[in-house]
Amino acid sequence: MKNNIRELRQGAGLSQAALAKDLGVSRQTVNSIETGRYAPSLPLAITMARYFRRTVEEIFHVDE
C-alpha cells in the first residue's frame, strides 16, 4: 500500500520520532508505514488522517 505519510510529515517539519510520539507508536512503525513494508490498522490509518487533516483515501493508495 502506497502512502503520502513521508511527504506530509516532512511538510509539517516533523521527525519520524516526533510523529511516532504524537501518534503513540514507535519510530520503527512510522518508518515501516512510510516505506510500505507495513499497512497500518484501520484505527491507526484514521488517526493519521485526522492528525494531518486529510481523508484516509488522500493518504493511502492501493497498489495497482
Task: Describe each model-derived feature in a short phrase.
Residues 43-58:
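DNA major-groove recognition helix of helix-turn-helix/homeodomain DNA-binding modules
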Residues 17, 28, 57:
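Key DNA-contact positions within bacterial/archaeal DNA-binding proteins
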Residues 58-64:
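Short amphipathic recognition helices of helix-turn-helix/homeodomain-type DNA-binding modules
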Residues 3-22:
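Short basic helix-loop element that most often maps to the first helix and adjoining turn
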Residues 25-38:
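Recognition helix of helix-turn-helix/homeodomain-like DNA-binding domains
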Residues 10, 38-39:
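Short amphipathic helical patch at the helix-1/turn junction of helix-turn-helix
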